[in-house]
């Protein structure tokens, strides 16, 4: 019997990275890319709230590698990742092969195992250059200007932040707060990101590390580069050394909080209070320093001793390169100090943005639920449009579910479901490849094998006692 069938067809919809109703983020769904959160996970160890991610969107304005449909920075389950597929594709367009690009990116984004294939963007060299070069040239020009302003920014930022936090507290109307955001906060916040980006561009470490490894071997190269602070301390070490000074009575509590109260393990997340906001934080930290057998300043001195020994060996073995390498080490050290100081002040500005969000929450009656709105949605609320507030309960629930999961793999290839991955008892914590091993961890090594190989965070099995830290604190 003949039958007539009606076949209905429709285009396959491209999955969206973000659902604004629920606050679910998953950029791994938008294409077959390789993502890494190395370095990112140190700066942002928490699942981000919508407010925090919208803050990072402002940073993206200072990044030249954005192509519609191919994000450079994405969010997977609330955590930020960098799209290595895009970076390697752009390197290929500039004539740099994939192996070289992998090597050059190791210091900043970590090592990608040789066994992992990095898919590239399906665009020709000409298309990539046409799409990216105009933005790259524009951003490069802006960064050259910013590099000349970094030191002035570092010098003036603390007073500006103190003034702005006080002004925010004195605002009593939505219209006034919107005006303050547009005239003062948003421009300076964008400038802070540009300063941080420009300081990062000044990083000369990668090439020097490669040259030192070739000349002196990995161990001595690490020793020579472990003392970049030299006689002048890196800003990233100041809070730790400062705690020791407070514990010994060499620094007042007030001075410590004024200088370092904006720094902490959660400084890039808007919803979490800064140390200076918690009256018990410093007491707890000082008590911990007194109990701890670890002395930060002694550890730094140990690094200096290791540096001196490695440098003497270098002088004996490579006398012709001593002067040039010494100059390069000095330049790298100066660059590192500038970069860390700029990052510290950018973190101080982020505290001001947190104060802005809290004030929005006060004026709108939202309290800390305000962090489940984006910065643009906060401005809408201040202007009388409260439509986004209906999404807050679902976004809060999504954030809670993401936060209950263990940290995701450092490297992700292809589509990744964080909940399915977390449910697998043999999941890998270093790598997820949807096209190969997926969530499954490798088998334990054969008996008698005592050497562990791999890279930081690599999967493997070894028996012993460890202290487990699920999150920074």
Task: Identify the residue ranges that each predicted region occupies.
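Contiguous hydrophobic, helix-prone segments at protein termini
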Residues: 1-451, 455-456
């Amino acid at each position: 019997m003949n039958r007539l069938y009606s076949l209905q067809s429709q285009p396959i919809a491209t999955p969206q990275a973000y659902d604004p109703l629920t606050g679910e983020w998953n950029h791994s769904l938008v294409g077959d890319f390789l993502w890494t959160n190395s370095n990112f996970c140190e700066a942002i160890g928490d699942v981000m709230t919508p407010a925090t991610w919208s803050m990072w969107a402002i940073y993206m304005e200072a990044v030249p590698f954005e192509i519609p449909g191919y994000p450079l920075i994405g969010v997977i389950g609330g955590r930020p990742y960098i799209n290595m597929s895009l970076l390697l594709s752009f390197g290929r367009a500039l004539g740099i092969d994939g192996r070289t690009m992998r090597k050059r990116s190791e210091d900043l984004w970590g090592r990608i195992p040789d066994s992992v294939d990095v898919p590239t963007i399906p665009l020709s060299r000409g298309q990539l250059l046409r799409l990216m070069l105009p933005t790259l040239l524009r951003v490069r020009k802006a960064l050259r200007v910013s590099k000349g302003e970094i030191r002035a920014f570092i010098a003036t930022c603390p007073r500006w932040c103190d003034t702005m936090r006080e002004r925010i507290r004195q605002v009593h109307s939505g219209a006034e707060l919107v005006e303050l955001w547009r005239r003062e906060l948003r421009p300076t916040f964008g400038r802070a990101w540009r300063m941080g980006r420009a300081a990062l561009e000044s990083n000369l470490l990668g090439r020097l590390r490669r040259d030192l490894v070739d000349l002196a071997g990995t161990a001595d190269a690490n020793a020579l580069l472990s003392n970049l602070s030299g006689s002048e301390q890196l800003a990233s070490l100041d809070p730790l050394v400062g705690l020791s000074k407070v514990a010994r009575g060499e620094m007042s509590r007030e001075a410590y909080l004024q200088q370092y109260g904006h720094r902490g393990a959660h400084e890039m997340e808007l919803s979490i209070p800064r140390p200076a906001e918690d009256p018990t934080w410093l007491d707890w930290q000082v008590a911990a320093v007194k109990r701890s057998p670890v002395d930060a300043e002694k550890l730094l001195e140990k690094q200096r001793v290791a540096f001196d020994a490695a440098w003497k060996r270098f002088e004996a073995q490579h006398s012709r390169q001593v002067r040039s390498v010494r100059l390069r080490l000095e330049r790298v050290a100066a660059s590192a100090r500038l970069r860390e100081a700029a990052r510290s002040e950018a973190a101080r500005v982020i505290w001001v943005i947190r104060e802005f969000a809290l004030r929005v929450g006060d004026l709108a009656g939202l309290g800390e639920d305000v962090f489940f709105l984006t910065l643009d949605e906060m401005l809408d609320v201040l202007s009388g449009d409260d439509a986004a507030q209906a999404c807050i309960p679902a976004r809060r629930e999504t954030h809670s579910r993401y936060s209950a999961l263990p940290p995701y793999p450092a490297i992700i290839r292809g589509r990744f479901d964080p909940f399915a991955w977390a449910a697998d008892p043999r999941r890998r914590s270093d790598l997820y490849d949807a096209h190969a091993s997926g969530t499954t961890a490798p088998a334990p090594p054969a008996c008698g094998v005592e050497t562990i190989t791999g890279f930081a965070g690599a999967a493997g099995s070894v028996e012993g006692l460890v202290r487990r830290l699920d999150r920074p604190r």
